[in-house]
């Protein structure tokens, strides 16, 4: 195998696939990237057996062939080597040479026949989406993915294509049982499916698509395939049933307050310094045009903040995890946050006045 390619092109392809590599894997070949040169194209493959990322580029190939090299070593060499045209040459089955000008590097190889490939033959239900929109939907929900492995079905992002009011939408949903994030997109595409995408795959999808324009998505009962420009992600799904998230959405939260997002975030950020109990609890009091936050008891609080708001509904006193609140408010881009309460003991609904995303947060006892 021998080919020449510019550093820029090779580094971009390597950067795309490198995230799939499991650097501490006990199977040596899974720490490697597979390189395959044929038909004037070079294909790169990386996998941890759950996710496979491939990328390809066109270049001048002198000799077709394939091999696998240690991913991080190869990536670091290409990243640090000067700009220019790089020559890649498989000298023998066990040694790959990298040349650019007067620079020479040789790295050991593993037989490509040992490299596993995840099949995508059974994937159907393909839809095309705006990549920037999907990346934003992921950003607004992935923070709520659970790390609790005992409830493995919450360890991923629920991707739900469904019909609502004679229209078709795509929802991204995540919850850890303490908070839930939901983002919605009108697609108009008559496809219905519900899949749980693993957390690592979600991060890789977002990383790869966020600087592109269009993305193609195909799913089956057990896999998802994302195609974006010259990069393809194939991943296994979480085998489980995501809880009926629509039943979590509060229906009777009629005590509504609008707050400046930056003011609320800054107050929470300050007051959370002293919210150091198990739940990082902050008490919220809402009454007579006042939105108050405090840590500690009512008589002698450790920290207290007060914001002026327009509010004349029922008095509300509730407690929330300050970190969870900050995580949610950080996802809101508009100037105002809308918080809807039922009472002090029920979940609160948080949204932006003109957003397609909403958030639910459970109260904590104070």
Language-model regions: role of each:
Residues 1-366:
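Structural preference for solvent-exposed beta-strand-turn elements
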């Amino acid at each position: 195998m021998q080919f020449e390619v510019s550093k820029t092109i090779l580094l971009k392809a390597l950067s795309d696939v490198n995230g799939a590599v499991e650097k501490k894997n006990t199977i040596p070949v899974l720490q490697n990237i597979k390189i395959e040169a044929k038909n004037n194209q070079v294909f790169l493959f990386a996998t941890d057996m759950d996710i496979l990322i491939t990328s390809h580029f066109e270049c001048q190939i002198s000799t077709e062939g394939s091999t696998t090299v240690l991913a991080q070593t190869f990536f670091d060499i290409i990243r640090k080597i000067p700009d220019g045209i790089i020559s890649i040459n498989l000298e023998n089955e066990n040694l790959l040479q990298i040349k650019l000008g007067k620079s020479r590097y040789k790295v050991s190889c593993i037989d490509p026949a040992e490299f596993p490939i995840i099949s995508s033959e059974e994937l159907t239900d393909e839809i095309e989406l705006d990549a920037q929109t999907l990346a934003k939907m992921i950003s607004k929900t992935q923070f709520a993915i659970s790390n609790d492995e005992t409830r493995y079905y919450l360890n991923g992002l629920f991707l739900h294509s469904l019909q609502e009011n004679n229209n078709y939408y795509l929802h991204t949903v995540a919850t850890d049982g303490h908070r839930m994030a939901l983002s919605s997109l009108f697609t108009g595409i008559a496809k219905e499916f519900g899949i749980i995408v693993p957390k690592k795959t979600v991060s890789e999808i977002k990383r790869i698509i966020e600087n592109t324009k269009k993305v193609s998505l195909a799913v089956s009962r057990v896999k998802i395939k994302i195609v974006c420009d010259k990069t393809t992600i194939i991943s296994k799904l979480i085998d489980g049933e995501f809880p009926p998230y629509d039943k979590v959405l509060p229906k009777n939260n009629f005590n509504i307050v609008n707050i400046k997002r930056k003011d609320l975030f800054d107050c929470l950020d300050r007051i959370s310094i002293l919210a150091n109990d198990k739940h990082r609890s902050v008490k919220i009091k809402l009454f007579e045009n006042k939105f108050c936050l405090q840590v500690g008891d009512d008589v002698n609080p450790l920290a207290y903040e007060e914001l002026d708001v327009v509010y004349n509904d029922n008095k509300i006193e509730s407690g929330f995890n300050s970190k969870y609140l900050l995580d949610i408010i950080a996802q809101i881009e508009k100037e105002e946050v809308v918080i809807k309460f039922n009472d002090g003991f029920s979940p609160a609904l948080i949204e932006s006045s003109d957003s397609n995303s909403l958030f639910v947060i459970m109260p904590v006892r104070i």
